[in-house]
Amino acid sequence: MATPCIQNAFRRKTLPVRIGDLFVGSEHSIKIQSMTTTATTDVDGTVRQICALQEWGCDIVRVTVQGLREVHACEHIKDRLIQQNISIPLVADIHFFPQAAIHVVDCVDKVRINPGNYVDKRNMFTGKIYSDEQYAHSLEHLMNKFSPLVEKCKRLGKAMRIGVNHGSLSERVTQRYGNTIEGMVYSALEYAEVCVAMDYHDVIFSMKSSNPKVMVAAYRSLAYELDQREWSYPLHLGVTEAGSGTAGIVKSAVGIGTLLSEGLGDTIRCSLTGSPINEIPICIDLLKQTTELSERWGEADNPFAIHSSKQLGTRNTLNTPPWGNVYGLLINLTDVQLLTAEPIELLQCLGIDTTTGKIDPTTPEGVVVPKAMRSSPIVSEIEKHLLVFNKEDAPILNPMNEEEWLSEETLSAPFVYFEVTDIHTARRFFSLRQHSTQPVCLSFSLDPHLSKNEAIIDLSARLGALLLDGLGSCVLLDFVDIKLSRTLGFLILQSANIRSVTVEYVSCPGCGRTLFDLLAVSQRIRERTQHLPGGLKIAVMGCIVNGPGEMADADFGYVGSKPGMIDLYVKHKCVKSCIPIENAEEELVQLLKEHGVWKEPE
């Protein structure tokens, strides 16, 4: 494969796909999408939520369609929207029931299917082995079952999204390719081949995962495979089951922001637990941060970055005792902060409780201070707990001065700071220095005029894109809000699978299939378990339709099985079923104890 063009982004050229009254594709603006959380059969409630979503700036809305009752409800929903002159496209979300797709396409503008469960049964981890003959027979069966929907969509001029989800691949695909990025890509391509063979091209693809690293790699790989075949289909971007609050925003921004910066993506959704209304401002801010990249497209040898870190340079940590060989987080402290802050207050902002001696898991490894302040009493106090670096200890490289990057003085320093103003310049820096093993501290400044969400999105997109490719040795954050800086720093490191210092939560955004108050339960479980050690991943999923599969890499799962009942999972195995919801949280704690990961809060 040729070395990709990684320093410049061009919007990947894609076909225009009509969805109702709007078009999706590279010649059109990137659209924002969401999904209702009401029961689809609640026509009044669903219509109200759709209208509210449009008022907030949503361009496309999706509803769940489990069966024929929901199909009939969609007919009424669409009629109601037309009567109210609401033109937002309506999308039907289909799982396990092809007949629902065939019927509902009459009244909606697009259908979304999951290749993992549209024709084949989902993977039940039985260990079944498919022979080549059985595999070929399954592909023929796929063609026979899927082609009626393709034919009807083509005849009616309706669009389709082929939405692959990591963890819900079919048994057949998983047996041959594993629950891998390769499996995700081939799952999509099998369905794409049917569409192409039938000359149907109103198709959009998505490759979602709750893990941004997997998600980004899957989209890059699919885009490459599609373009190799000259299939210029649009992409819908999203990190599925991103969770709630700041952590959910960070995950979404790391994944979606990285791909937008590479010119990939024609529609986006931030799948946050709670009201879908809350997703829209985050999407708007995310697109605003990438406006320049999102509004232009062009040709390049390879306009998105399919590459390994070896093509860009190796990642060497500073390896400073007692830091050790980890990707560290440093906080920049200005002379103003050091001169005006109360010592106890500043230490608390850094995560250090001087009364109890307790160190927060999100305490940075060190701070960077002006050399003139090194001997001050407040810095001496900080040095009792953290590493302290003089700002003048290493060169601070100008992102616009390429000669400086490779100068003898620069290369002879023990490490360097590189100020990251944009992703593409940083990638060029690492590309030009790909043979250097010199540690690089990625330095980020945040505009103090940004809102909190804007700051979260800006840093997550810029830093996350580099971390996902394994670039840099540590991170230096310079932001007036020290506590926010360290919280964000570790959340981004965790989202990029670099470090895990706190419990990670996977939770779906909710939809018409959700069987309990997802946001309230998620918050209660978080409150009961957030003191547990980092590296643990807990999933809270609204239903069993996709919950068990889409929480693919979670250690423990809390999944709605039927109204008022919860199933508990260890990895992908259900170990306790049909637990009354009022007992389920205590049963989850007991399960954590049985597996030796529980400890009592201090």
UniProtKB/Swiss-Prot annotation:
- Name the job this protein performs: Converts 2C-methyl-D-erythritol 2,4-cyclodiphosphate (ME-2,4cPP) into 1-hydroxy-2-methyl-2-(E)-butenyl 4-diphosphate.
| One GO term (biological process) | isopentenyl diphosphate biosynthetic process, methylerythritol 4-phosphate pathway
Please name the PANTHER family in this protein's record.
4-HYDROXY-3-METHYLBUT-2-EN-1-YL DIPHOSPHATE SYNTHASE, 4-HYDROXY-3-METHYLBUT-2-EN-1-YL DIPHOSPHATE SYNTHASE (FERREDOXIN), CHLOROPLASTIC
A Gene Ontology molecular function term for this protein is:
4-hydroxy-3-methylbut-2-enyl-diphosphate synthase activity (flavodoxin)
> Which SUPFAM superfamilies did the record assign?
Nitrite and sulphite reductase 4Fe-4S domain-like
Could you confirm whether the keyword Membrane appears in this record? no
Q: Reaction catalysed?
A: (2E)-4-hydroxy-3-methylbut-2-enyl diphosphate + oxidized [flavodoxin] + H2O + 2 H(+) = 2-C-methyl-D-erythritol 2,4-cyclic diphosphate + reduced [flavodoxin]
Provide the species name: Chlamydia trachomatis serovar A (strain ATCC VR-571B / DSM 19440 / HAR-13)
Cofactor(s) listed: [4Fe-4S] cluster
UniProt enzyme class: oxidoreductase
* Entries under InterPro entries matching the protein: Dihydropteroate_synth-like_sf, IspG_atypical, IspG_bac-typ, NO2/SO3_Rdtase_4Fe4S_sf
Protein name according to UniProt: 4-hydroxy-3-methylbut-2-en-1-yl diphosphate synthase (flavodoxin)
Q: So what EC number does this one have?
A: 1.17.7.3
- Cystine pairs annotated here are none
